[in-house]
């Protein structure tokens, strides 16, 4: 048995367009944009989706959006999503990147939220 939940919605913007994307999304959603000093490629859109981290991520790739799913068992969650039709396309440290039906990306990562939030909001899978 393992647990998982959507941890973040990321708006991936090419690095040279990221500042403009941050300005747009911050104004469009009426929220404050806050860079993450420990991870400069991310700028959090504070409270854009209450309970879910939302950020613009500067990437060296095409623009897209993706979800981060946090889990207490990366192998089990990856296997569950693959059984549903996803395909693992890469791995970086503990994180796995999957392409899901429809072509979008999902990152499976270790639990990032506080224990109380994760316990209260995560789905339990057999």
Please provide the spans of the model-predicted regions.
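Core segments of cupin and vicinal oxygen chelate
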Residues: 1-51, 76-77
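N-terminal beta-strand motif that seeds the catalytic metal site of vicinal oxygen chelate
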Residues: 1-22, 65, 69, 112-126
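Alpha-helix boundary/capping residues
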Residues: 25-28, 81-85, 122-125
